[in-house]
């Protein structure tokens, strides 16, 4: 099984390329946001604990997120691969993720870092805001989100580069062109793991 992380600034195409990986390879997509919402809706013990933090305006602790992911991935032993979206965002989260995967005899195999120039990110997000009506896709909020991403993610890029799993991918062009840049990376690792 391949464990794939997709990094990239807001508007870099992470969601779109995740969909391409699912379509091409049958991978399972795990989004921390979706996972939290599902646990809260199901009123599980973990979901109730998370709701308590959220309702008080606090971030859900890393340990709780990792516990939710652990619960989910333990059911995914027969999948071709997992795409992690929105996690990890910090070095402690990355370390916790490595420990969690190691419990199953797995590791982070591939980190895809979608690289898109800032001007193009802003243009994509502004266009997305017009289409989707998302209130967080305005220029002021976009710049703040890009700054937060740059500050939080730079250490992770170094972290995964040192582990020789980071692959920078040019994130400009059509959806298909970008997917064709990613495919050889994934194909190489699929051959090695089979």
Curated annotation (Swiss-Prot):
Its EC number is 2.7.4.3. The keyword Translocase does not apply. The keyword Cytoplasm applies. Residues 31-60 are annotated as: NMP. One of its GO terms (cellular component) is cytoplasm. It is found in: Cytoplasm. Pathway: Purine metabolism; AMP biosynthesis via salvage pathway; AMP from ADP: step 1/1. Residues 127-137 are annotated as: LID. ATP binds at residues 11-16, 128, 173. InterPro entries: Adenylat/UMP-CMP_kin, Adenylat_kinase_CS, P-loop_NTPase. GO terms for biological process: AMP salvage. AMP binds at residues 32, 37, 58-60, 86-89, 93, 134, 145. It catalyses: AMP + ATP = 2 ADP. GO terms for molecular function: adenylate kinase activity; ATP binding. SUPFAM superfamilies: P-loop containing nucleoside triphosphate hydrolases. Keywords: ATP-binding, Cytoplasm, Kinase, Nucleotide biosynthesis, Nucleotide-binding, Transferase. HAMAP family: Adenylate_kinase_Adk (MF_00235). Consists of three domains, a large central CORE domain and two small peripheral domains, NMPbind and LID, which undergo movements during catalysis. The LID domain closes over the site of phosphoryl transfer upon ATP binding. Assembling and dissambling the active center during each catalytic cycle provides an effective means to prevent ATP hydrolysis. Catalyzes the reversible transfer of the terminal phosphate group between ATP and AMP. Plays an important role in cellular energy homeostasis and in adenine nucleotide metabolism. Monomer. This is Adenylate kinase. It comes from Porphyromonas gingivalis (strain ATCC BAA-308 / W83).
């Amino acid at each position: 099984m391949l464990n794939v992380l997709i990094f990239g600034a807001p508007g870099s195409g992470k969601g779109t390329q995740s969909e391409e990986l699912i379509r091409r390879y049958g991978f399972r997509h795990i989004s921390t946001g979706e996972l939290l919402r599902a646990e809260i809706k199901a009123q599980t013990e973990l979901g109730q604990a998370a709701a308590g933090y959220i309702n008080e305006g606090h971030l859900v602790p890393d340990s709780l997120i990792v516990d939710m992911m652990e619960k989910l991935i333990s059911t995914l032993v027969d999948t071709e691969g997992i795409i992690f979206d929105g996690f990890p965002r910090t070095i402690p989260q990355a370390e916790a993720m490595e420990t969690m995967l190691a419990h199953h005899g797995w590791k982070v195999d591939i980190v895809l870092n979608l690289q898109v120039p800032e001007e193009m990110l802003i243009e994509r997000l502004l266009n997305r805001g017009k289409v989707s009506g998302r209130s967080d896709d305005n220029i002021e909020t976009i710049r703040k989100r890009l700054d937060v991403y740059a500050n939080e993610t730079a250490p992770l890029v170094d972290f995964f580069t040192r582990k020789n799993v980071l692959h920078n991918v040019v994130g400009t062009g059509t959806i298909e062109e970008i997917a064709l840049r990613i495919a050889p990376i994934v194909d190489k690792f699929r051959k090695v793991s089979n």
